[in-house]
């Protein structure tokens, strides 16, 4: 049974086409992984099929009575609302139904006998619907999902305005899962989840009986939950049966076959053109030349396989730092209240340390405290001598109004435009990306612009806060290689063991030092 039909969909931004003439059907129960390099249009596609964005051409048609759940990273959580109230919002339609039923019961007190029977029947239908949807078990459902995604440790009476970005994402995801729609649309749901919560989500999606479309660059996670791959590539959307690994096998063969066909056709074209050039003027062979020219004119050209530009992240290194990188004495981190026990930490030159732990326990706060960007609650943190810092924040702090060229030029004013373009291209950005405003780029493309600044500023210490968020597979692979070859010191917050295994020399588990219940 088809629950969504997409026909002849085309869309772009200005003269930059995102996809062209895309058509497909979504069937009930399909578990789809939507993949593609940064900037291929995955999030744009999600916005179109949910009606948040109108396509330039084509139609999106949903079957009647299909409920769609989309995890919108930009959804508003109102100040003054508790986590429990936000999660209970998943059942707003049921609460409305209960209100309607109660109003009917109130009206029965003054209703005439004829009207009474009609109202009783209507209230009975509403009661049955509430029972069928487990309305009277809502609190149990909320608690179950809250435990699974680590929200209980925050306290369900906590105001949502006090949550970190990662905690907020968990609330939005929990609310979406509680609503149990006919189709789930998930855009990088693991970005702000901890290892144990990713594992719970994996099990949940594995057994999910309805359909979902999942965008994720976490390949082990993707492989474990999907049975179909939709690949956004070169303005097209292609369907592959199986998981990501199976897709890669088939796609590689497909690319090789297309390359071979392209070369054969180019050789044939060269041969035909040569024959026409040599024989079109001779009376005896003119007809044969015209015949071959007609064949050339009618030939359907095979395009050469295209691949997303491969990034190159080579960090510029400054002179060697002193032996000590950081040293803390009874450091307590936090804002209004302490987030940690007194910490006595030590980091020395050439160490590559990863900080892990649950969302909201202070990983970013620790980084900023060590760098002196925010004051400590108590204690002190000292940075060593001759430190040249490269700092990658989790999210961009700019307004995004500048073009990528101007964004880089702002930091590297001595560069020529050619040098700016070359630096951005080496980070995997195309000419269209480079000339666009930063705000219209995907999350992965924006991260590459910030990485462009980072790698070109000489450093001997890199402090990285979730650098893999939003990056596609090729970019993550290249970033890991570059960090492995980096001769300076690294302090990094990361939630992906697959990324930091073979890179980290030491792991600091902040959950062992936090004052929060986890």
PLM features per residue range, with description:
Residues 313-315:
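Post-kinase regulatory C-tail/linker adjacent to protein kinase catalytic domains
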Residues 250-305:
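Intracellular alpha-helical coupling/juxtamembrane segments of multi-pass membrane proteins
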Residues 1-260, 309, 318-518:
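ABC ATP-binding cassette signature C-motif
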């Amino acid at each position: 049974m088809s629950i969504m039909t997409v026909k002849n969909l085309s869309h772009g931004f200005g003269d930059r086409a995102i996809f062209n003439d895309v058509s497909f059907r979504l069937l009930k129960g399909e578990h789809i992984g939507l993949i593609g390099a940064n900037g291929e249009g995955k999030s744009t596609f999600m916005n179109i099929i949910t009606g948040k964005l109108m396509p330039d051409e084509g139609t999106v048609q949903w079957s009647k009575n299909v409920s769609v759940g989309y995890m919108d990273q930009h959804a508003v959580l109102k100040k003054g609302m508790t986590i429990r109230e936000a999660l209970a919002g998943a059942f707003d339609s049921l609460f409305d139904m209960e209100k309607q039923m109660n109003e009917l019961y109130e009206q029965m007190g003054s209703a005439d006998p004829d009207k009474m029977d009609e109202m009783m029947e209507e209230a009975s239908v509403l009661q049955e619907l509430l029972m069928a949807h487990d309305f009277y078990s809502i609190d149990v459902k909320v608690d179950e999902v809250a435990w699974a995604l680590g929200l209980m440790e925050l306290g369900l009476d906590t105001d949502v305005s006090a949550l970190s970005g990662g905690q907020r994402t968990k609330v939005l995801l929990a609310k979406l899962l509680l609503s149990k729609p006919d189709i789930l649309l998930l855009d990088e749901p693991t970005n702000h989840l901890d290892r144990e919560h990713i594992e719970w989500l994996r099990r949940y999606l594995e057994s999910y009986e309805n359909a979902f479309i999942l965008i994720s660059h976490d390949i082990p996670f993707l492989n474990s939950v999907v049975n179909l791959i939709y690949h956004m590539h070169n303005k097209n959307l292609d369907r592959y049966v199986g998981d990501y690994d199976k897709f890669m096998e088939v796609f590689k063969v497909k690319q090789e076959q297309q390359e071979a066909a392209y070369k054969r056709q180019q050789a044939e074209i060269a041969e035909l053109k040569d024959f026409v050039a040599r024989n079109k003027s001779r009376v005896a062979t003119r007809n044969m030349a015209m015949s071959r020219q007609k064949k050339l004119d009618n030939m359907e050209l095979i395009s050469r396989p295209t691949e997303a530009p491969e990034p190159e992240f080579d960090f510029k290194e400054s002179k060697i730092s002193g032996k000590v990188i950081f040293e803390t004495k009874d450091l307590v981190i936090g804002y209004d209240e302490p987030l940690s026990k007194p910490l006595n930490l030590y980091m020395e030159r050439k160490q590559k340390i990863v900080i892990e732990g649950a969302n909201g326990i202070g990983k970013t706060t620790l980084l900023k405290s060590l760098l002196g960007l925010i004051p400590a609650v108590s204690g002190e943190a000292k940075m060593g001598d001759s430190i040249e810092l490269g700092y990658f924040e989790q999210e961009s702090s700019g307004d995004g109004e500048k073009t990528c060229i101007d964004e880089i030029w702002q930091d590297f004013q001595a560069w020529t435009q050619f040098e700016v373009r070359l630096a951005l291209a080496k980070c995997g950005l195309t000419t269209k990306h480079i000339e666009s405003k930063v705000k219209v780029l995907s999350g992965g493309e924006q991260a590459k612009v910030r990485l462009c600044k980072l790698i070109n500023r000489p450093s001997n210490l890199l402090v990285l806060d979730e650098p893999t968020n939003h990056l596609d597979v090729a970019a993550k692979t290249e970033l890991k290689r570059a960090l492995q070859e980096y001769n300076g010191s690294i302090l990094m917050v990361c939630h992906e063991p697959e990324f930091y295994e073979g890179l980290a020399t030491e792991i600091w588990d902040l959950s062992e030092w936090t004052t929060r219940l986890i």
